[in-house]
Swiss-Prot record:
UniProt function note: Mediates the nuclear export of encapsidated genomic RNAs (ribonucleoproteins, RNPs). Acts as an adapter between viral RNPs complexes and the nuclear export machinery of the cell. Possesses no intrinsic RNA-binding activity, but includes a C-terminal M1-binding domain. This domain is believed to allow recognition of RNPs bound to the protein M1.
Keywords assigned by UniProt, alphabetized: Host nucleus, Host-virus interaction, Transport, Virion
Pfam families: Flu_NS2
InterPro entries in UniProt: Flu_NS2
Protein name in UniProt: Nuclear export protein
Note: Average number present in a viral particle is estimated to be 130-200 molecules.
Any single GO BP term: exit of virus from host cell nucleus through nuclear pore
Assembly and binders: Interacts with protein M1. May interact with host nucleoporin RAB/HRB and exportin XPO1/CRM1.
Gene for this chain: NS
GO CC aspect terms: host cell nucleus; virion component
Length: 121
């Protein structure tokens, strides 16, 4: 993962964790947690692709890795929808910018995860 992506993740996570939304900070904390989880999962997929020998390790370690991958795609789609919803309802420009950047990053991560997973299949 390049340094721009790392800093984008860190910046967005920091800003999202500091925001207090009228809806519920508990929901936002859940989004931040899922965002971090997806980042870690995407990183592990990328590392496995970099070392193609890890495909066999990945399959042996977790026979249901395709199922896990499907669950991660469901999580990222849910998170994308949540971010879109938050973007529609927020009136604060700082929050709008943060959510737009988060949405862009999530879409990039989803695309990278698809690319990595096709290389692993």
């Amino acid at each position: 993962m390049d340094s721009n992506t790392v800093s984008s993740f860190q910046d967005i996570l920091m800003r999202m964790s500091k925001m207090q939304l009228r809806s519920s900070s508990e929901g936002l904390n859940g989004m931040v947690t899922q965002f971090e989880s997806l980042k870690i999962y995407r990183d592990s997929l990328g590392e496995a692709v970099m070392r193609m020998g890890d495909l066999h390790y990945l399959q042996n370690r977790n026979e249901k890795w395709r199922e896990q991958l499907g669950q991660k795609f469901e999580e990222i789609r849910w998170l994308i929808e949540e971010v879109r919803h938050k973007l529609k309802i927020t009136e604060n420009s700082f929050e709008q910018i943060t959510f737009m950047q988060a949405l862009q990053l999530l879409l990039e991560v989803e695309q990278e995860m698809r690319t990595f997973s096709f290389q692993l299949i």
